[in-house]
């Protein structure tokens, strides 16, 4: 019922637990923008992350596979040319980007995403890609950064990169896919001054800033000619403070996800849902026909 061949921006928000949202009982008004967008979107309320680290979320969202013992596939050697969402996107003439505000050398992210055919946008502080990877790498220059900590540039800045490359792709008349990884909602919880009414250095302030930056991103995107033909998938990589030594705490794997601006009616999906099902479900809403080796399924 919606747009069939839109641009797609997938935002993976760092450590964005479901219990930060008003919809799940939080009374701190930390996420007014996500709450508003959820009411206008397909909103998945019974979604669980596959792991407790960013690389597990990346693995689930791009490869659509459950977590395997040992290291995440993202971190492993010889992880190029796997069947991924990029395989499907390239079949449909999309150009996929991985946009990250740190140096994607960390956790082998660049070799993983580059090895699946994503062009890379990162801080590029001198850690080259493997010679086997033929995709492009674009540097986020110092003059494009307003605030940065050890993890990367602030969410305001990473979203400006997303808009920059969306503008470039739109001018080239080619549909684009972006995997945007944020970093602000992470210790030490620092972010630009003057944006929100909570102090730096605490989780609640980082969550509220993260939400502020998301709201500004959507507002800025709304002004662009490509907005009307762009679907936004906004999900967490994993929960905050979710790692444990002995058992899996289910509550610490509960994350939100929305599909916004798809042309479909807003609804809440309460069926049990995994991160590995997010992209197959999006493709279902887009009415795509494709041959797949993805393990995740269209929830519908």
What do these predicted ranges mean?
Residues 1-300:
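Solvent-exposed soluble domains appended to multi-pass membrane proteins
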